[in-house]
Curated annotation (Swiss-Prot):
Signal peptide: 1-28
Location of the region described as C region in the Swiss-Prot/TrEMBL record: 145-321
Region (D segment): 123-128
PROSITE patterns: IG_LIKE
Lineage: Viruses, Riboviria, Pararnavirae, Artverviricota, Revtraviricetes
CDD domains on file: IgC1_TCR_beta, IgV_TCR_beta
Protein name, UniProt field: Viral T-cell receptor beta chain-like T17T-22
Organism: Feline leukemia virus
Length: 321
C-alpha cells in the first residue's frame, strides 16, 4: 500500500515519490488484479492489458515503468471518465468499462515499449492532501526484434560437496538455469513433492551470461541448504523448477524449432546415503530385498502344501489298513 499525491500537475515531485515507493517495496496484495502478468511480443505486434480494480474504487491509473527508471503516469480515470494523461503515445489507447475494469491497448509495438505496466486504484479522487493507491502485481512486457531469440532455460542441479558436509554438517544443492531469453522466469525448490522456501537463496534477478549488446541469453542460480542428515536420506527427492514465461499458444510461430511457449523446466536429484549408496543403488537394494522376501515366502508356502499333502496321504493309508 502506497500513499502519495497522484495529481498529474505534481510533475517531478510525483515521479520522485512514486519511484522511491515502488522501487523500495513489492506490489501490495490489495485485491486489485492485472492480466496477463507476462508478455513476449515481436516488434509491430499489439497487446491488450486488463486491470480489475478493488470494488468500490472510483479512481484508476495506468503507469509505465521502464528498466532503471521510475514509473511514468500514462492515463488517469475517475468514475470511468478520463481525468488526465502523462506521456501517452498515439499508438496507445485505454478505456474503463461500466463494470469498472479497464483495458490498456498498445499497437505497433516498439522495442522501447518493453516495461512493467502497473495499474492502481483508489477509493476517491486525488486531492491536495494525498490519496492512497493500491497497486497490482503489474504486467511485464518484453518486445523483441525477432521471436526466434526467445528460448526456454536449461536447468541443472548440482549436488552438495562432501567438504562442506564434513565441515558444517550442512548440504547445499545448487540449481543453475542457463540460456533463456527473455528474463521472464520464476524459480522454486520442491522437496518430496512440496514447495519449500526455508533455506532457499536465489539471485535477486537473472543476469546476462556474457557482457555485450549482442548477447541476449540470461542465467539464474539458486541454492537450497538442508542438514547433512536430511541430504543423506536416499528417500528424499529434490527438484528445482523454473517457470519460463514465453510465447502464448495463440502466438504465430514460423520456425522449424519447437515453439518456446510458457513452460516449466525442471531438474532433480535424490539424497545420497552416508555409507556410499546412491539413490539408484538404494532402490535396487530395496527391490532385491522385496524379491528375496517373496521367494522365501513362496518356498514356505510350497513347503506347507507339501507337508499337508504328505499328512493327507498318511491319513488315507491308515484308513485303508
Amino acid at each position: 500500500m502506497i500513499s502519495w499525491l497522484p495529481s498529474v500537475a505534481m510533475g517531478s515531485r510525483l515521479l520522485c515519490c512514486v519511484a522511491l515507493c515502488l522501487l523500495g517495496a513489492g506490489p501490495a496484495d490489495s485485491g486489485l488484479t492485472q492480466t496477463p502478468r507476462h508478455l513476449v511480443k515481436a516488434r509491430g505486434q499489439q497487446v491488450t492489458l486488463s486491470c480489475f480494480p478493488i470494488s468500490g474504487h472510483l479512481s484508476l491509473y495506468w503507469y509505465q515503468q521502464a528498466v532503471g527508471q521510475g514509473p511514468q503516469l500514462l492515463i488517469q480515470y475517475y468514475n470511468r471518465e478520463e481525468r488526465g494523461k502523462g506521456n501517452f503515445p498515439e499508438r496507445f489507447s485505454a478505456q474503463q468499462f461500466p463494470d469498472s475494469h479497464s483495458e490498456l491497448n498498445m499497437t505497433s509495438l516498439e522495442l522501447t515499449d518493453s516495461a512493467l505496466y502497473l495499474c492502481a486504484s483508489s477509493p476517491n479522487e486525488d486531492s491536495e492532501y494525498g490519496e492512497t493507491l493500491y497497486f497490482g502485481e503489474g504486467s511485464r512486457l518484453t518486445v523483441v526484434e525477432d521471436l526466434k531469440k526467445v528460448s526456454p532455460p536449461k536447468v541443472t542441479v548440482f549436488e552438495p560437496s562432501e567438504a562442506e558436509i564434513s565441515r558444517t554438517l550442512k548440504a547445499t544443492l545448487v540449481c543453475l538455469a542457463t540460456g533463456f531469453y527473455p528474463d521472464h522466469v520464476e524459480l522454486s525448490w520442491w522437496v518430496n513433492g512440496k514447495e519449500v522456501r526455508d533455506g532457499v537463496s536465489t539471485d535477486p534477478e537473472p543476469y546476462k551470461e556474457q557482457s555485450g549488446a549482442n548477447v541476449s541469453s540470461y542465467c539464474l542460480s539458486s541454492r537450497l541448504r538442508v542438514s547433512a542428515t536430511f541430504w543423506h536420506n536416499p528417500r528424499n527427492h529434490f527438484r528445482c523448477q523454473v517457470q519460463f514465461h514465453g510465447l502464448g499458444k495463440d502466438d504465430q510461430w514460423d520456425y522449424p524449432e519447437a515453439k518456446p511457449v510458457t513452460q516449466n523446466v525442471s531438474a532433480d536429484t535424490w539424497g545420497r546415503a552416508d555409507c556410499g549408496f546412491t539413490s539408484a543403488s538404494y532402490q535396487q537394494g530395496v527391490l532385491s530385498a522385496t524379491i528375496l522376501y517373496e521367494i522365501l515366502l513362496g518356498k514356505a508356502t510350497l513347503y506347507a502344501i507339501l507337508v499337508s499333502v504328505l499328512a493327507l496321504m498318511a491319513k488315507v493309508k491308515r484308513k485303508d489298513s
